[in-house]
Amino acid sequence: TDTRHRVTNWTLEKNKATDRPSNTIQLPDWNYNGVSQVTGTSNTFVGTSFVELLRQNGYHTIHCGKAHFGSIDTPGENPTHWGFEVNIAGHAAGGLATYLSEQNYGHTRDGKPYSLMAIPGLEDYWGTGIFATEALTREAIKALDKAKKYNQPFYLYMAHYAIHVPVDKDMRFFPKYIKKGLSDKEAAYASLIEGMDKSLGDLMNWLEKNDEADNTAVSYT
């Protein structure tokens, strides 16, 4: 629980708590650097990831999407430090600058992030018109295709940045909800939800097509 590991709020920058100032309560010195598998960083909960245990027992381990395990420049920020052999677009941030490839998911034209929330690792999709949710899904399927060749069990942790602000419009689905009479904001929110639904369906279809559906446990939380 949060009270055991003392990561009681969202994390981002190293050694910086994200609490709002309060004149009425004394804020605790919580673990605002997040979690890690190694010692040496203050205000960090140290523990062993179950993903590391899976890796040690022969699983090929894949992370795709939001990580948000540890603050920037701490060991915990990188999913590969948690037993993941493959990391797709995971870093310290728990949010995102934008879902839009037209804005390079938070990067300038010369490739520099203009926000700490810029999504890394999706350069191949910049400027393509592909929404971040779809880009992550495609990359996850590519990783599964590779995993299929390794002749070992696999673990995919699919952690979409959706649903999270900014509530960008996924134009694959947005017009449908406008036609249903929803406001722009409501329709945009609904489009984020349907994008996640499609992603789950695509992954389930991969399991079916590759004869893995009856041999795979799927947990949706």
Model-based region annotation:
Residues 140-188:
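Active-site His/acidic residue clusters
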Residues 220-221:
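Conserved small/polar residues in nucleotide/adenosyl-binding loops
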Residues 73-89, 166-180:
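Aromatic- and acidic-residue-enriched segments that line the glycan-binding/catalytic groove
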Residues 195-206:
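Active-site neighborhood of glycoside hydrolase catalytic domains
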Residues 1-49, 53, 59, 73, ...:
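Active-site segment of extracytoplasmic enzymes that catalyze sulfate/phosphate-ester chemistry
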Residues 93, 97, 121-158:
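Catalytic-adjacent loop/helix segments of enzymes that bind and process anionic phosphate/sulfate esters
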Residues 34-42, 122-134, 183-195:
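The substrate-binding groove and active-site-proximal loops of carbohydrate-active enzymes
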Residues 4, 67-68, 93, 161:
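Catalytic metal-binding/acid-base residues of hydrolase active sites
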